[in-house]
Amino acid sequence: IYTYIGLVLFLTGANIGFMPAGNYLGQVLAGQNWRWIILPIGMLIGYFIVKAEPAVYVLNKQVEEVTDGAISAGTMGAALSAGVSLSVGLAMVRVLTGISILWFLIPGYAFAIGISFVVPKLYTAIAFDAGGVASGPMTAAFLLPLAQGACVAVGGKIVTDAFGVVAMVAMTPLITVQLMGLTAQLKQRRARQEQPLPAAPPAFADLPDDAIIEL
């Protein structure tokens, strides 16, 4: 019963609140003379909207618990926010320019798969889970209508230019989380290299002059 009530409330809010608001905001921002303003504003919205995803909060807590704090929830949240912000920025570039989504998806996924061979497997697994979690209901209910409204304002093709936001949001966390893992790996390697070697035990320096040395 609680699940049913929650779904009804969420879908009602999405249809009445989130989707019309996102569509209207996209039309207003992209309809101005300085339509490129939607690029930084969209990135800012993408940075903070991922923090409202319940699944993201759960994933961050689980990662922190499983790794015993080695990967904190704050670090995971920052990596996901940066990834979603980047994806929304690229989506707005597509809306304004009409560039095909394949120019972003193919290099993005190729880079994500390529870097997975040098990143610790833990970060790779977390990254792929994070990609699915970040592209949750808030993305479909607000960011997609935002792109659709902007596309209408600039006179673009909604089907080819606006759709694909969810795919972009699912892709970028694969890159940002794995880059976070690569950075952590390089820091650990540098710390081991800079760690001083233990001093060698003295051989004969501390022996008295009349000591007998047995060979």
Each language-model region and where it sits:
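Membrane-helix cytosolic exit motif
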Residues: 163, 167-192
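Hydrophobic alpha-helical transmembrane segments in multi-pass integral membrane proteins
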Residues: 12-17, 140-157
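Transmembrane alpha-helix boundary signature
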Residues: 10-24, 50-55
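Transmembrane helix-loop boundary segments of multi-pass membrane transporters
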Residues: 13, 31, 90-113, 126-135, ...
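Alpha-helical transmembrane segments
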Residues: 61-69, 116-131, 188
